[in-house]
Amino acid sequence: MDQPVASNQQKQTLNSEQRTPSDGLPLSVYMITYNNGVTIERALQSVADWADEVIVVDSYSTDGAQDIIPRYTEKLYQFETKDLREKYQYAHDQCINPWTLFIDADEWLMDDIKKEISTIIRGTPSCDGYIASRRNMYLGREIKHGGWYPDREIRLYRREKGRWEGGLHAKVTVDGTVGTLKHFYMHTPYADIAHQIRTIDRYSEAFAEDLRSSGRRFHLVNLITRPVYRFFRDYILKRGFLDGTPGFIIVVSTMYYVFMKYAKLWEIEMKEKKQFRDRF
């Protein structure tokens, strides 16, 4: 099976004018991935027989995801960058249909939201983009409180009206009117607690680098107070305690994530100071 493959050094991108959509639902679904072999098949299964086009942008996965993707789409691209916004925008740029929808490799769509989206696209849409709500499943339980709820963002939008902005927590912005979908899509962020810890380690490092590159400096008060604030906000004010043991694990792991991103910012600054001293 031929696969469109691109890298940030060698972008073999087909011009959208050279490609034409099929007679299916005029929707391009795209996702980015890296080592999501545990979850990506469910994500692909939920959209492969529904949308006209499914695009996946990988970063040279090594966990088997790269073998799963071609079973559901020929449009697999390889693209490496530390800039999450750039990777999402690259995936967006491969889309050819007038409407685009992005999902992550650990998310999937149920029939009700697919029917709603199909009705919008095949009808006369009143908006240029639509916010969708996400239902988060964690350790066998749907999380309905705390820092993970509510969880809403623009997911469906006209291709020519949307663009990606931001850094590590990049989001789509739409130049036009934005509505809200009635139905939810599903999300299982972690296969288990070990997977969660690995993800926290990766994201806290990326966040610390993003803070440093934007000129932010380490302050001890952030390391001390911000994790405590997150506990108070998410567990008490947002009633994370109502989600039982999973809710408590979530808030403690969130505190750990906040602590580690500022600890790693401090570590980056210490390495910079050492490099500066070693020059003399």
What spans do the regions from the language model cover?
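Conserved donor nucleotide-binding strand/loop of the catalytic core
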Residues: Q66-I96
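A conserved acidic beta->alpha catalytic loop
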Residues: S46, W50, D58-D67, T81, ...
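Short, conserved active-site loop motifs that form the nucleotide-linked donor/cofactor pocket
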Residues: L27, E74-K75, V178
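Conserved beta-strand positions in the Rossmann-like core of class I SAM-dependent methyltransferases
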Residues: I55
